[in-house]
């Protein structure tokens, strides 16, 4: 079967890899000159299934009001007056209750855990190198309330069979030695020892090379104008004067998926702006060993080989990609507070990107009302974490193979009135990755 994939970020390239492995003839189209040059370029570097959780959570509306008056707030909103922004925010607010939070987190953890199995199998099969580490993730708490509130997430982790360790402040240095100097600022942490880290852009570039060797065609520097429709099917993709035809089509356009699908499929995918710093390491003993996540500021600090990646924050500001100095100051403040001697912050590279976010936090992976159109988008801040699992899942659905995980509640149909998931089993109902 011929398959055209729109988008060469980590999700699009992973989709291409698994579809090619399944025997399909795959073409990837992207406006950039190479893979992973937008949202996948400089993210926080975490592969953290256990921390897969929606931003829409109980208490977030009240916190958002408080954050409006804080200098280093993890979330900021700038109203643009568009009906889409207001509608998306309203849908997100409706998900900010315990029932929806637990349902959405369960879906996200299910896909994220499966995705980690997939990337592990991919590593074993190909030997792909991307400055990856399997040292776990440590969530840091600065208040006693945060420490005690971890019980809610621990319940989900236990249901999903995810190993964890709840650590007091005095135990943090056993996981992250450099934190010994700042333990007095912290109340404890939640470690997930099975989580991983790695350079998402490097991974995507290397996987694109492997996919090309497997027969995938990459067409760069081509802007997609529109999808052509005949009846209940897509008949082609128009890029300027060129039209590309296939048997099936995959939209992995990230935040730009919504606009491309306008008048065809309604999806609530909105750009959530984030930032990162990439800092050269000057003292390895004073740098992080793996990844820490500052719960107060929602900032992740990740170790690559000779670099530290500091990433996070969320701005609901539309497609604004301007670098804001005050956001850099927040990233610098957090890394200097926790790892003051790890690297030269003044030499850091500052970056921003748009994460494709759904109001319930769960990505949209699967079929649409158009028979040969599939979606793989809306992964929010977890595109790197979920990419391989989403790619394998999508390949199975297109190939007519029963997926290894329940997936009916991951598709766009869940936004339809009256939708009820067929899946009612435990979160860890996962078959081994192929």
UniProtKB/Swiss-Prot annotation:
GO CC annotation terms, alphabetical: cytoplasm; plasma membrane
Enzyme Commission identifier(s): 1.4.99.-
Keyword annotations from UniProtKB, A to Z: FAD, Flavoprotein, Oxidoreductase
SUPFAM superfamilies associated with the record: FAD-linked reductases, C-terminal domain, FAD/NAD(P)-binding domain
Leader sequence residues: none
Keyword Repeat: no
Pfam families reported for this sequence: DAO
Pathway linked to the protein: Amino-acid degradation; D-alanine degradation; NH(3) and pyruvate from D-alanine: step 1/1
Co-factor requirement: FAD
Membership in a protein family: Belongs to the DadA oxidoreductase family.
Official protein name in the record: D-amino acid dehydrogenase
Taxonomic path: Bacteria, Pseudomonadati, Pseudomonadota, Gammaproteobacteria, Enterobacterales
